[in-house]
UniProtKB/Swiss-Prot annotation:
Swiss-Prot/TrEMBL keywords: Antibiotic, Antimicrobial, Bacteriocin, Lantibiotic, Lipid-binding, Secreted, Thioether bond
Gene: FlvA1.B
Subcellular location, record wording: Secreted
Name of this protein: Lantibiotic Flvalpha.b
Main location, first listed in the record: secreted
Organism of origin: Ruminococcus flavefaciens
């Protein structure tokens, strides 16, 4: 029996507990394509909305106009 799950035959895949790994990966990629296939317009709108919400939360937490991350380099500039 081949140890690489991708290269197993159909008969070998039926005899293992996890089933056909290649078929499962294909199903997962199809599901991700369906989720991510909303179109570029919706993606742009979501990106702008998430950025706006992030800036509003940052401002609400006391950040005076800068959108910063938790990195050490940025934290020093945000505390001014």
């Amino acid at each position: 029996m081949n140890k690489n799950p991708i290269y197993r035959s159909e008969e070998e895949a039926k005899n293992i507990a996890c089933g056909n790994v290649a078929a499962e990966l294909d199903e997962n990629s199809q599901a991700l394509d369906a989720i991510n296939g909303a179109g570029w317009k919706q993606t742009i709108v979501c990106t702008i909305a998430q950025g706006t919400v992030g800036c509003l939360v940052s401002y609400g937490l006391g950040n005076g106009g800068y959108c910063c991350t938790y990195t050490v380099e940025c934290s020093k500039t945000c505390n001014k």
